[in-house]
């Protein structure tokens, strides 16, 4: 079934989660004017508005009722563009207190860069408070555009939040920068073989404070492949749950070592909040701070971690995650049918790996998944916070795990300016999934943060790899 796309516009708030077009191929952005008599100062006299909003112009200096910011969006669905098609960004200077207002400024200074290696810079008049920029890309991938309000000397106006936005072209064609290693499955079957010899025995299960009076909570330790690094986390079970009555629900956290997971409760589920690092649960803050600043500082980023991937930090983390699920599958309360995995950022990486490696997962829900397209930078794509690329890092690419996931998957958020979980990486992840799937991209959303005004673009497919 052909995927659909949906655009929604609405107010949003900052929230933590865990964690262009060249002028017809010339490499020069097109300058667009309105009407046959338009001049360069007439740039972008139109922009997308909600049904009830009407443009209100003011010629006074910026005296915002709320906070002044540059708002922007693409003329079309931001993930629908084809390679070579013009991607138009409409930007205007407005106000958090009244979106109808448009403010002038002296100059609008902008920069754009794309996965295909193109870069653009420019300065335009801000007299109208509006700007349209149009670019084209030469290959599938993403583009990032930054626009700043400046004074007549080109200095940034500190009271105005810049616009940073993005778009994707050739969405359906996007794949990882390199192919999946031919021995990917052999590697992981070998690692899982180490777990097969270690039953998930309970080392301790101590009562813990429950956030819900209808649930029992436990701090749990489970034997795993490394006797010195057991599985740890919090388990919650509804009171008076009968044998065979509950779904399994697992929750994985983002990149951090400064805190312990907390008990999570969901009706009809036994929920395990996984501690990624085999740390003790519920210790004092100093215990976690010492680990964050010591043994676990920069974990997973050490080059020696990938000289032999069978000894890497993330390999051991994933094996503990799989062992945690094996423990839950052995519990009498499980209904034997439903397994739900949740996680964002590094938690999304873990959840995807478990869904790929352990049979029986029935639903995967993730957001801003980390470790997607780890080789992207090596072919010139825009990339951000990832370990330095080596071929062995491919053993941990979330996209290659996604290609082995067959259950329904919902990607609740991907940011169009997120260069920790890059837009291109998230597109490759979505394209690799083999089951029913849906993804929602958020314009101007960075890693774990939503913009002042939220615009989303969604794609879904009933099933089958693209």
Which residues make up each language-model segment?
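C-terminal catalytic histidine-bearing segment of alpha/beta-hydrolase fold enzymes
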Residues: 427-466
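Short beta-strand element of the alpha/beta-hydrolase
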Residues: 244-254
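Cap/lid segment of the alpha/beta-hydrolase catalytic domain
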Residues: 258-319, 376-377
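N-terminal cap/lid segment of alpha/beta-hydrolase-fold proteins
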Residues: 200-241
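N-terminal targeting or regulatory segments adjacent to alpha/beta-hydrolase or S9 domains
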Residues: 51-215
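The feature captures the conserved acid-bearing segment of alpha/beta-hydrolase catalytic domains
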Residues: 380-432
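Primarily recognizes the serine-hydrolase "nucleophile elbow" in alpha/beta-hydrolase
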Residues: 323-381
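C-terminal motif of bacterial Sec signal peptides marking the signal peptidase cleavage site
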Residues: 22-23
